[in-house]
Amino acid sequence: MPGEDRMNQDEAKRGNNFTCFHAGPKEGWAQFRLEPPDVPMSAKGKLFLRSLIGSAGLEMSLNVVPPGQGMPFLHKHRQNEEVYVVVDGRGQFLVDGECIDVAEGSALRLGPAAARAWRNNSEAPLYFLCLQYRADSVVEGGTADGQKVEGKPAWPD
């Protein structure tokens, strides 16, 4: 990317009020693997970002599902909602028995108790972001929490 700091997946740029981690282009997301310690399976194509970026209130993951693949079991959460944002591709989510078609630009919010699974029923990879946060934790949304800061942006040349 133009102007980006040269970072690899093992390092992040940190400042007083930010952390920036570069996972690389979405076409490389398949290299990531989730191997939960208490589950006898692994998930290829999933990278959790919370610890990498130092987030205190949100878990987020990058995900890619190859054609013909999907989540092999239903799951739900005890207290966290999830929002899935499809970045590229097409697929389906099964939510409480209802099949929902998704495609690039789809955003799907699921309450904690929703039994869910997903699959890629297309011929191209399905890329999505998953944002997980405690249900009812956002008190003010939109711009209500924002505050204007004096001055103008001073971009480096």
Language model feature labels by segment:
Residues 92, 112-138:
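Ligand-binding loop in jelly-roll beta-barrel domains
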Residues 79-81, 85-91, 96:
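Glycine- and acidic-residue-biased ligand/ion/polar-headgroup-sensing regions
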Residues 54-58, 66-70, 90, 134-137:
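Short, charged/polar surface micro-motifs in flexible loops or helix N-caps
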Residues 1-58, 139-157:
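A short, N-terminal "cap"/entry segment at the start of jelly-roll beta-barrel domains
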Residues 61-63, 84, 129:
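Conserved hydrophobic/aromatic positions in well-ordered beta-strands
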Residues 42-48, 61-77:
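Conserved short histidine dyad/triad with adjacent acidic residue
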Residues 58, 63, 98-100:
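Well-ordered beta-strand scaffold positions
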Residues 97-112:
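Short acidic-glycine-tyrosine-enriched beta hairpin
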